[in-house]
Amino acid sequence: MKILSFKDYNELSKEASKIVLNQVISKPNSVLGLATGSTPLGMYKNLIVAYQNKNIDFSKIKTFNLDEYYGLSKHNNQSYYHYMMENLFNHINIDINNINIPNGTASDILKECSDYEDKIKNYNGIDLQILGIGVNGHIGFNEPSTYFEPSTHVVTLDKKTIESNSRFFSSKEEVPTKAISMGIKTIMNAKKIILLANGKNKADAIFKTVNGKIDPNIPASILQLHNDVTLILDKDAASKL
């Protein structure tokens, strides 16, 4: 596990975008695993600028998002589909047919999960997976549990997650209580992983991810077993290491 600590969020975002750019330049048809939330926003802004400056071509890449709220229409402005379109896809030359985000309103949700998993396998897995981390140590929407859920699945969201995500909604009651998420095995099968974290509220989860025992109660701790994972942190998130 490689740990990079930066003085602030801007420097963290620059490093993350540099890794993504290098991946796409070295393999133009890369399969990228993408994350949402506030942490990757700076990285996405940098990628848009790189595209506008003609430093990068996204036309051949494929993307798979980690998760999506269950029961939320993709047209809802809090859906992760909406987030990705607004914060990245509408501003780069990606082929819309190469964008993959779980369908939270699929009529057969279990089939949606297995189809999503199969599609990732059909592309020979993810080349570079981008992760954030929850204050409870979740990655994707793999919440603290008694076991590691292997493949794409429906999950009931942890109270801490609902509370944390309520800042994006008018009230806590509006936050969906379930989501579709890539599983731990799916994430761990990525050839390379970068995890981004900023802020003191993430310091405890980062400490347990790096120094704790491998424990499904801290889902990110499983990353200790991956052979190419880099944690990209600001000094606050790294403050307990």
UniProtKB/Swiss-Prot annotation:
Protein name: Glucosamine-6-phosphate deaminase
Family: Belongs to the glucosamine/galactosamine-6-phosphate isomerase family. NagB subfamily.
Organism: Clostridium novyi (strain NT)
Active-site residues from the entry: 67, 136, 138, 143
A GO molecular-function annotation: identical protein binding
Disulfide bonds: none
Hydrolase in keyword set: yes
Catalytic activity: alpha-D-glucosamine 6-phosphate + H2O = beta-D-fructose 6-phosphate + NH4(+)
Gene3D superfamilies: 3.40.50.1360
Pathway terms, separated by semicolons: Amino-sugar metabolism; N-acetylneuraminate degradation; D-fructose 6-phosphate from N-acetylneuraminate: step 5/5
SUPFAM superfamilies the UniProt entry points to: NagB/RpiA/CoA transferase-like (SSF100950)
Primary role: Catalyzes the reversible isomerization-deamination of glucosamine 6-phosphate (GlcN6P) to form fructose 6-phosphate (Fru6P) and ammonium ion.
Record keywords, A-Z: Carbohydrate metabolism, Hydrolase
Top-level taxon of origin: Bacteria
Designated gene of the protein: nagB
GO cellular component terms given for this protein: cytoplasm
Recorded coiled-coil stretches: none
Enzyme Commission (EC) number: 3.5.99.6
